[in-house]
């Protein structure tokens, strides 16, 4: 296909010469070198998976998860960002290439549909990135870790008291989730706690503690 000067991204000899003339008119070759030096750096590409994992402080991960639930848009961001932020601090690249708000859409079971709990989804993203492999045994190991996390969640009495020192509502009623699904987990607890409003402070505290507990458990 023939390229034309009007095409986006096409640079002709005439365009280069015209640009050079402008640089020269503006102060000589030195000005051109300065302009080139100020050009944005080429983004560093991320390596293929799996990425490096290090042992993280589970308490710090959990406390960030609790806090990020309230500050960063719900359960999906809470678990994902609690782990990611620690990996950015302790490992650096390539984790620093990951966007902080990647999992905000997972709140309330993905767009409010009450499907998979966002805390599980956010944590699973990180798990996949450190355990992914193309060989069958690696694939099975990856799946097994996520599977165990989901089963643990379903059998857990939520919320725990682990983060009660951060909460204005300690010692909340505990109810077994029975499912990794947001709707089931939240509905069973809400019925037992007498909560009818999804924006009730008690429900917010419960889910913040759940997000913290997921982050704590993954580490």
Identify the residue ranges that each predicted region occupies.
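A short glycine/serine-rich beta->alpha loop
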Residues: 64-73, 106-115, 198-204
């Amino acid at each position: 296909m023939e390229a034309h000067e009007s095409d986006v991204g096409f640079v002709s000899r005439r365009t280069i010469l015209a640009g050079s003339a402008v640089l020269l008119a503006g102060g000589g070759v030195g000005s051109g070198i300065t302009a080139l030096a100020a050009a944005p750096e080429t983004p560093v590409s991320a390596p293929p998976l799996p990425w490096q994992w290090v042992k993280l402080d589970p308490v710090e991960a959990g406390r960030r998860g609790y806090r990020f639930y309230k500050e960063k848009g719900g359960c999906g961001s809470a678990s994902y960002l609690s782990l990611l932020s620690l990996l950015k601090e302790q490992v650096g690249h390539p984790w620093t290439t990951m966007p902080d708000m990647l999992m905000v859409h997972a709140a309330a079971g993905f767009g409010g549909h009450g499907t998979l709990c966002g805390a599980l989804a956010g944590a699973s993203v990180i798990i996949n990135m450190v355990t992914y492999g193309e060989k069958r045994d690696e694939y099975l190991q990856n799946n097994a870790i996520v599977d165990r996390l989901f089963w643990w969640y379903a059998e857990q009495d939520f919320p725990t008291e682990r983060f009660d020192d951060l909460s204005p509502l300690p010692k909340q009623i505990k109810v077994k989730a029975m499912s990794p699904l947001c709707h089931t987990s939240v509905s069973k607890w809400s019925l037992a706690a007498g909560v009818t409003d999804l924006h009730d402070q008690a429900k917010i505290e419960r889910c913040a503690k759940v997000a913290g507990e997921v982050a704590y458990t993954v580490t």
